[in-house]
Amino acid sequence: MCMPCFTTDHNMAKKCRDCCGGNGKCFGPQCLCNR
């Protein structure tokens, strides 16, 4: 898990990917990084 995901933030998917180093996505309230 990288960081919390907020559905109200339209840039959240990008922030999640960036936080994961380019490979991650929001799953519910969590940003999950793909190994």
UniProtKB/Swiss-Prot annotation:
Keyword Secreted in annotation: yes
Single Gene Ontology MF annotation: toxin activity
GO CC annotations, alphabetized: extracellular region
Pfam families: Toxin_5
Keyword vocabulary terms for this entry: Chloride channel impairing toxin, Disulfide bond, Ion channel impairing toxin, Knottin, Secreted, Toxin, Voltage-gated chloride channel impairing toxin
Location in or out of the cell: Secreted
Reported tissue expression: Expressed by the venom gland.
InterPro entries in alphabetical order: Scorpion_toxin-like_sf, Scorpion_toxinS_Cl_inh
Cystine pairings recorded for this chain: 2-19, 5-26, 16-31, 20-33
Note: The protein sequence was deduced by comparison to other short insectotoxin sequences.
Comment text on domains: The presence of a 'disulfide through disulfide knot' structurally defines this protein as a knottin.
Physiological role: Toxin with unknown function in healthy organisms. On glioma cells, interacts with chloride channels (probably ClC-3/CLCN3) and MMP2 at the surface of glioma cells. This complex is then internalized via caveolae, thus inhibiting the chloride channels necessary for cell shrinkage and tumor propagation.
Family, as annotated: Belongs to the short scorpion toxin superfamily. Chloride channel inhibitor family.
Protein name from the UniProt record: Insectotoxin-I4
Lineage: Eukaryota, Metazoa, Ecdysozoa, Arthropoda, Chelicerata
